[in-house]
Curated annotation (Swiss-Prot):
Gene Ontology CC: one annotated term: cytoplasm
Annotated EC: 2.7.1.39
Name by which UniProt lists this protein: Homoserine kinase
Keyword Cell inner membrane: no
InterPro entries: GHMP_kinase_C_dom, GHMP_kinase_C_sf, GHMP_kinase_N_dom, GHMP_knse_ATP-bd_CS, Homoserine_kinase, Ribosomal_Su5_D2-typ_SF, Ribsml_uS5_D2-typ_fold_subgr
Organism: Mycobacteroides abscessus (strain ATCC 19977 / DSM 44196 / CCUG 20993 / CIP 104536 / JCM 13569 / NCTC 13031 / TMC 1543 / L948) (Mycobacterium abscessus)
Keywords on record: Amino-acid biosynthesis, ATP-binding, Cytoplasm, Kinase, Nucleotide-binding, Threonine biosynthesis, Transferase
Pathway: Amino-acid biosynthesis; L-threonine biosynthesis; L-threonine from L-aspartate: step 4/5
Record's subcellular location: Cytoplasm
């Protein structure tokens, strides 16, 4: 039976955006980015109040179906607790439906809130492994969720031997010379919409190509950033998604033509540039002329709770 937490507990969570795939690492590689949603939560005697400002305001539900609320409840249940009532305030900076992990961030934020409340009540908190598992259950894949939990870059995987998939990840420390720039358009795109564009089968040649590139990318991210251009080549999902987001495909191709290791961020439409030098002025102008906002980011250390 769950213990009902007292009213008057408060916690604040800062959760980072993330980018998945990074070119060849489809549904397995991710990286945490220094763009954050901040969630403030108080326990009350009863009821639920949800407020959202910034990204998603006026678009997301303000009741118990809100993903942050569902994740809070799931995390508390995993910790053997429940809240009598909640005030949830979301200050969102992560753009929605752009390929920057906004839904994974919401799930991780809610679980982080649960950990904060459990800690304030003197109860054991959930481990990082449990956070990755629970957040990935909301997502259906672990790449974004694991990055937001663990920070840095992540290699993630799943095992499906039982009824419930087991999700796991390990962190990679990103080379300090690597700089990240996100090119973010106004248009939105959902993962579900672009995932249906992917073929059910690929050739052995293309599979072998991507295996070599994703292995190389783990080296490029951690020790050899000079290999990023080759390491970010992909044949499994970016070419297939190009028709659904021609502007993103165009910007990605132009950046790569200028020697910039650019990839589609998750399912897009944002484009991520991984580089050790500033972007060429011509690349900046080209992306901005196509309606993209360029945002310089660092690698995040992951979710923080206070």
């Amino acid at each position: 039976m769950s213990e009902v937490l007292p009213a008057g507990l408060a916690t604040t969570v800062l959760v980072p955006a993330s980018s998945a795939n990074l070119g060849p690492g489809f549904d397995s590689l991710g990286i945490a980015l220094s763009l954050y949603d901040e969630i403030e939560v108080n326990t009350t005697e009863s009821g639920l109040k949800v407020a959202v400002e910034g990204q998603g305001a006026g678009e997301v539900p303000l009741d118990g179906s809100h993903l942050v609320v569902r994740a809070i409840e799931r995390g508390l249940a995993a910790g053997g607790a429940a809240a009598p009532g909640l005030i949830v305030q979301c200050h969102n900076k992560i753009p929605h439906s752009r390929g920057l992990g906004s839904s994974a961030a919401a799930a991780v934020a809610g679980l982080g809130v649960a950990n904060g409340l459990l800690a304030k009540a003197g109860r054991a908190v959930l481990s990082d492994d449990v956070l990755v598992q629970l957040a990935s259950e909301f997502e259906g894949h672990p790449d974004n969720a694991a990055a937001s939990v663990l920070g840095g870059a992540v290699v993630s995987w799943s095992e499906t031997s039982g009824a419930t998939p087991i999700y796991a990840a390990t962190r990679l420390d990103v080379h300090p010379d690597i700089k990240i720039v996100a090119a973010i358009p106004e248009e939105q795109s959902s993962t579900a919409h672009t995932r249906v564009l992917l073929p059910q089968a690929v050739t052995h040649v293309d599979a072998r190509f991507n295996i070599s590139r994703v292995a190389l990318l783990t080296v490029a991210l951690t020790a050899r950033p000079d290999l990023l251009m080759t390491a970010t080549e992909d044949r499994l999902h970016q070419p297939q998604r190009a028709s659904a987001m021609p502007a993103s495909a165009d910007v990605l191709a132009y950046l790569r033509s200028q020697g910039v290791a650019a990839v589609l961020s998750g399912a897009g439409p944002a484009v991520l540039a991984l580089t050790t030098v500033d972007l060429p002025d011509s690349a900046v102008k080209y992306a901005e002329d196509q309606g993209f906002s360029l945002v310089a980011m660092a690698v995040s250390a992951g979710v923080s709770v206070r």
